[in-house]
């Protein structure tokens, strides 16, 4: 028998989602598939390959190691590193033909100098902080002066410029409109100086759904690529997505227990009446948080079964006394699909769907279908 826990990834769902995004943004804009964090837990390389086959034209990651993994897998398309690059990584980034994000003049100078020393030009995108409060040039006179100086550096090919929205997935759209206005003002001021860019981009998943005016030259789908919506406040009817991940396990043990039996560490749960307890080979080391102790639910034979007692590092227990003929090796859905969506698990945890799928640990095999 194979591993008793696995994440089933439906690649046909990824294809479908990219095609839906393409229909929404039109034929003339580039799609940069965001595959950071191991493709939001789905597997960066398989997801990237399918996304590119389905119509994406570029990839984005957050760490150099993520870009290197994609290159070693034979992917040749442009890859944008969305975050910080340390000076001692710049040479490797150039060797792997990774497009870098520049958000400070001193960083730009360092990249340019290393590129010139290698007889290369480094392709970069400039990041403008229009209201996220993270990395980026400020959209004021000081920031504009820095951007102008960066664009004058030898050794750089300043291909693109971008920003990131903080609240595009919320019901109140005013802050996103304000951010977009600030970004366009920066672009207009730079254009007045004769500085233009091949790729202007700011539309994340929520903006793709809610703000068509922000599409510009390129869009950056992240969570929607995987079939999950950015929040409950976006109009889901605009984009018909298919979730790609279902986390599954097989029951490893079933036993009948009497009323008063204690379950798991700390004896925090006491069985109120005779029942059947099933053990699952799933714990917090696999990305099933301890916070779900006596709170989470799973699907056994299509019925809900409650997690009882504390979630352990490698195991957890569920009460299956109300479900007939539960046996060892029966398949259990931990989350995924319409009957137990990842969003429900996120609600139990007080978090977001992004975090739940990213939590799925590296020792959980990904099994690809479709």
Swiss-Prot record:
Pathway: Amino-acid biosynthesis; D-alanine biosynthesis; D-alanine from L-alanine: step 1/1. Keywords: Isomerase, Pyridoxal phosphate. It catalyses: L-alanine = D-alanine. It is an enzyme of class 5 (isomerase). GO terms for biological process: D-alanine biosynthetic process; peptidoglycan biosynthetic process. Pfam families: Ala_racemase_C, Ala_racemase_N. Its EC number is 5.1.1.1. The keyword Isomerase applies. GO terms for cellular component: cytosol. The active site is at 36 (proton acceptor), 265 (proton acceptor). Substrate binds at residues 134, 313. The modification N6-(pyridoxal phosphate)lysine is found at residue 36. Its cofactor is pyridoxal 5'-phosphate. Catalyzes the interconversion of L-alanine and D-alanine. May also act on other amino acids. Belongs to the alanine racemase family. This is Alanine racemase.
């Amino acid at each position: 028998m194979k591993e008793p826990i696995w994440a089933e990834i439906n690649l046909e769902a990824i294809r479908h989602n990219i095609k839906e995004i393409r229909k929404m943004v039109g034929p003339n804009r580039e799609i940069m598939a965001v595959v950071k964090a191991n493709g939001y837990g789905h597997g960066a390389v398989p997801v990237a390959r399918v996304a590119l086959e389905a119509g994406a034209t570029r990839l984005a990651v957050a760490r150099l190691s993520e870009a290197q993994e994609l290159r070693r897998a034979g992917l040749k398309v442009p890859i944008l590193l969305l975050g910080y690059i340390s000076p001692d990584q710049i040479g490797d980034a150039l060797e792997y033909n990774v497009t870098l994000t520049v958000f400070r003049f001193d960083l730009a100078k360092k990249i340019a100098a290393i590129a010139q020393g290698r007889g290369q030009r480094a392709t970069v995108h400039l990041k403008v902080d229009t209201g996220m409060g993270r990395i980026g040039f400020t959209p004021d006179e000081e920031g504009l002066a820095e951007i102008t100086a960066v664009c004058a550096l030898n050794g750089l090919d300043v291909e693109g410029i971008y920003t990131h929205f903080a609240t595009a997935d919320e019901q109140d759209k005013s802050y996103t409109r304000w951010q977009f206005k600030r970004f366009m003002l920066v672009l207009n001021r730079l254009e007045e100086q004769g500085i233009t860019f091949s790729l202007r981009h700011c539309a994340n998943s929520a903006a793709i759904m809610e703000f068509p005016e922000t599409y510009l030259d390129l869009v950056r789908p992240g969570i929607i690529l995987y079939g999950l919506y950015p929040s409950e406040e976006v109009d889901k009817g605009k984009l018909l997505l298919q979730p790609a991940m279902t986390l599954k396990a097989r029951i490893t043990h079933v036993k009948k227990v009497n009323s008063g039996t204690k379950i798991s560490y700390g004896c925090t749960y006491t069985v109120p009446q005779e029942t059947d307890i099933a053990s699952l080979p799933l714990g917090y080391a696999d990305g099933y948080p301890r916070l779900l102790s006596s709170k989470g639910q799973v699907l056994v034979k299509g019925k809900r079964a409650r997690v009882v007692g504390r979630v352990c590092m490698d195991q957890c227990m569920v009460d299956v006394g109300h479900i007939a003929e539960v046996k060892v090796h029966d398949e259990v859905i931990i989350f995924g699909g319409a009957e137990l969506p990842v969003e429900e698990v996120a609600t139990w945890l007080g978090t977001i769907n992004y975090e739940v799928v990213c939590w799925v640990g590296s020792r959980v095999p990904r099994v690809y279908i479709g």
